[in-house]
């Protein structure tokens, strides 16, 4: 680096050599901490491993006092004779290192460590007793969105008998769960997932109309359309903030919503309903297969996270890092003996074929298909619709404020709130993966009695806590409930819309998980397998959309922090790693979109609808504003109070200070190249080109 470069750039590209968490680590699978991490995250690439290695290396090294020859001789004479042998074992030669490396990793990719007893025992929440949690809650922490409750109140009851063949969403192919073919007999599979009984509960045209109606939404905050719309003006898209940052320029917001629909709902509908003529029943078969694959991956990742490293002891620093991450994760696997169908192998890949690729694409937008939502029952249908609508509005609002060619227009308060949103989304997604892993295990092993299976069927747990988890309400309150967060919400229109989207996902996931618990039946209610299956599939739909929205937030965080130079975005210490683990487990359900790919898609959408970004404000008569104050009123009950005062997210760190972790875990190869170009002083080519003349 040249001495003439400004100090700020030297801080961005530190010349400090990266420290290794374990001394003399061999280049192979390794021993100690890196051997443990490779056992946990072995897969398509080593990005998680490299980032975690830097997490250990970023900690300040232990200071050692320099000793002279006399002091070293005195210390050596005072040491016991066995210390020399112990030291020689700590510094093995190449052959010994290779042998320890082999012993310290799994023999092959299909073998999964069974983990220590504390990882195998316990229920849905791990070692925490759900009954003890219920005793501490005292009251319900589930606070559904008032807008959702209003929509649910006006939703008519299901009328499956009145749905004709022409309204059923197209031809129905025989349902199947590909990953379980040959492993589960047909009758048992149909009992676990009765896909053949999932007939449409309402007419598709009816659900399509209802998705375009949003009670309580003023002009400017449009609901999800059924098809691409031309309400936005073409030409220049102005990104300057209004004088009052609590509102949006109406024209820019409409243009952002047009872009959002083009890359989400319109993209999935164009690829399925219009081009390939895929039926909603095929989408549901894919969803069931993807959820089972996800459950397997969630079990494998959780087991590896809690497994003891074999072949070597960890040093103190590495052991503490491992302990902290294992204690923070929500992935608490059920014992292998209880779920043999989940624990029979290692990580599974996504379903192959063009249809599966389409269903995993478009930022997780499968729930925007009215024919798919029509297959759900009333509560799950409204929950999926509401989550889709609010995340669509939030995506449009983000695209009305963030653009690679107008980064200067982003406000500090907007950049600061993004990290808080990502924190909550990562915890929600991780807890949903854990829930799906447990409920799928319970469905596939109906004769196994396990505390975790009993917990997910415990209605009072899911009435008391969203997703039945104290960690979710803890993360929500920690990120969005303090004074600084409330101030950010009140003083920014974008932050209000983002908060409403998080609240909608909270409401939707709480609704469908409670629906599953009720469908499991009790002494006063019959078991309803079809309703339970619909709840599981609805959770998969909402999780897929949550992941697409989270990738949108990640793209905006990286744009603000790395291309815009903002230091305001902060995240919990383990949020990048937590979200990367979720993305690894959910690959069968969702094809992630890196920031570089996201902005390339946005640029293509802007060219399609003829929009050109500019860092200016619109002039009269198109300078009217839209106020999301109605969402602030909706957010009054959110977030609920936490169950305990402990931290779920860990210490907050600035994104610019952990850019190497962000780059390796969340940005992908193209984003990494863009970041390197930006740090070196050249334009971040992966994040957009100059505006068109």
From Swiss-Prot:
Could you list this entry's UniProt keywords, alphabetically sorted: Host cytoplasm, Host nucleus, Late protein, RNA-binding, Transcription, Transcription regulation, Virion, Virion tegument
Biological processes annotated in GO? regulation of DNA-templated transcription
Motif mapping: Nuclear export signal: 647-670
Write out the annotated subcellular location.
Answer: Virion tegument; Host nucleus; Host cytoplasm
Ranges of Acidic residues compositional bias?
48-57
Q: Does the keyword Transcription apply?
A: yes
Q: Where is this motif: Nuclear localization signal?
A: 63-75
Processing and modification events after translation? Phosphorylated by US3. This phosphorylation is required for proper nuclear localization.
Signal sequence extent: none
User: Where is it found, in Gene Ontology cellular component terms?
Assistant: host cell cytoplasm; host cell nucleus; viral tegument
Q: Say yes or no: keyword RNA-binding present.
A: yes
Q: Which InterPro entries match?
A: Herpes_UL47
**Basic residues composition-biased segments:** 63-75
Chain segments carrying region Disordered:
1-32, 48-126
Q: Pfam families, per this entry?
A: Herpes_UL47 (PF03362)
Gene Ontology MF terms in the entry: RNA binding
Region RNA-binding: start and end of each range?
A: 50-75
Q: What does this protein do?
A: Tegument protein that can bind to various RNA transcripts. Plays a role in the attenuation of selective viral and cellular mRNA degradation by modulating the activity of host shutoff RNase UL41/VHS. Also plays a role in the primary envelopment of virions in the perinuclear space, probably by interacting with two nuclear egress proteins UL31 and UL34.
Question: What quaternary arrangement does the UniProt entry report?
Answer: Interacts with US3 kinase. Interacts with UL31 and UL34; these interactions seem important for efficient virion nuclear egress. Interacts with UL41/VHS.
Q: What does the miscellaneous comment read?
A: Expressed in late in the infection.
Family stated for the protein in its record: Belongs to the alphaherpesvirinae HHV-1 UL47 family.
User: What's said on domains?
Assistant: The nuclear export signal is CRM1-dependent.
This chain belongs to which protein, by name?
A: Tegument protein UL47
Taxonomic path: Viruses, Duplodnaviria, Heunggongvirae, Peploviricota, Herviviricetes
């Amino acid at each position: 680096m040249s001495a003439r470069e400004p100090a700020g750039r030297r801080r961005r590209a530190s010349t400090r050599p990266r420290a290794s968490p374990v001394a003399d680590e061999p280049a192979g699978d390794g021993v100690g901490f890196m051997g443990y991490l490779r056992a946990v995250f072995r897969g398509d690439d080593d990005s998680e491993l490299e980032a975690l290695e830097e997490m250990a290396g970023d900690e300040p090294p232990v200071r050692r006092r320099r000793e002279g020859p006399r002091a070293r001789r005195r210390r050596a004479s005072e040491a016991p004779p066995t210390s020399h042998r112990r030291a020689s074992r700590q510094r093995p030669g190449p052959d010994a290192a290779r042998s320890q490396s082999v012993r310290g990793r799994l023999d092959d990719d299909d073998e999964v460590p069974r983990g220590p007893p504390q990882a195998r025992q316990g229920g849905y929440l791990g070692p925490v007793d759900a009954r003890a949690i219920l005793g501490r809650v005292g009251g319900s922490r589930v606070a559904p969105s008032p807008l959702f409750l209003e929509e649910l109140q006006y939703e008519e009851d299901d009328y499956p008998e009145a749905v004709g063949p022409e309204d059923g969403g197209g031809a129905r192919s025989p349902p199947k769960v590909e990953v379980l073919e040959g492993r589960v007999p047909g009758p048992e599979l149909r009992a676990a997932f009765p896909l053949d009984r999932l007939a449409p509960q309402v007419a598709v045209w009816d659900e399509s109309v209802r998705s375009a109606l949003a009670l309580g939404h003023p002009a400017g905050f449009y609901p999800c359309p059924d098809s691409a719309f031309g309400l936005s003006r073409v030409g220049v898209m102005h990104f300057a903030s209004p004088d009052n940052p609590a509102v949006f320029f109406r024209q820019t917001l409409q243009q952002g919503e047009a872009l959002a629909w083009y890359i989400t709902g319109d993209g999935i509908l164009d690829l399925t309903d219009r081009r390939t003529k895929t039926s909603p029943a095929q989408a549901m078969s894919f969803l069931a297969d993807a959820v089972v694959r996800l459950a397997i991956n969630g079990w494998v990742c959780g087991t590896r996270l809690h497994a003891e490293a074999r072949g070597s002891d960890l040093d103190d620093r590495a052991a503490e890092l491992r302990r902290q991450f294992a204690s923070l994760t929500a992935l608490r696997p059920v014992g292998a003996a209880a779920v043999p169908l989940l624990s029979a192998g290692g990580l599974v890949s996504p379903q192959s074929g063009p249809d599966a690729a389409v269903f995993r694409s478009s930022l997780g937008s499968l729930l925007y298909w009215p024919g798919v939502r029509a297959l759900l029952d009333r509560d799950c249908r409204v929950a999926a619709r509401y989550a889709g609508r609010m995340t669509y509005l939030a995506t449009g609002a983000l695209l009305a404020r963030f653009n690679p060619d107008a980064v200067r227009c982003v406000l500090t308060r907007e950049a600061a709130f993004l990290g808080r949103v990502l924190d909550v989304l990562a915890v929600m997604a991780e807890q949903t993966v854990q829930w799906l892993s447990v409920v799928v295990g319970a469905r596939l092993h109906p004769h196994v009695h396990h505390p975790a299976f009993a917990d997910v069927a415990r209605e009072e747990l899911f009435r008391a806590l969203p997703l039945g988890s104290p960690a979710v309400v803890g993360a929500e309150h920690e990120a969005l409930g303090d004074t600084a967060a409330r101030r950010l919400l009140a003083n920014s229109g974008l932050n209000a819309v983002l908060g409403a989207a998080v609240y909608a996902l909270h409401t939707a996931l709480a609704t469908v998980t409670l629906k599953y618990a009720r469908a499991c039946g009790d002494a006063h209610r019959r078991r309803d397998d079809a309703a339970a299956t619909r709840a599981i599939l609805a959770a998969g739909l909402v999780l897929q959309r949550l992941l697409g929205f989270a990738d949108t937030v990640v793209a905006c965080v990286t744009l603000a922090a790395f291309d815009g130079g903002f230091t305001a975005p902060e995240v919990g210490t383990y949020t990048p790693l937590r979200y990367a683990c979720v993305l690894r487990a959910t690959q069968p359900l969702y094809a992630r979109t890196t920031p570089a790919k996201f902005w390339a898609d946005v640029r293509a959408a802007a060219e399609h609808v003829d929009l050109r970004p500019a860092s200016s404000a619109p002039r009269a008569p198109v300078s009217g504003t839209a106020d999301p104050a109605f969402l602030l009123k909706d957010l009054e009950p959110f977030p609920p109070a936490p169950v305990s005062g402990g931290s779920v997210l860990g210490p907050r760190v600035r994104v610019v200070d952990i850019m190497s972790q962000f780059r390796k875990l969340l940005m992908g190869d193209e984003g990494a190249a863009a970041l390197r170009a930006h740090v070196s002083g050249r334009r971040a080519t992966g994040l957009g080109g100059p505006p068109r003349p």
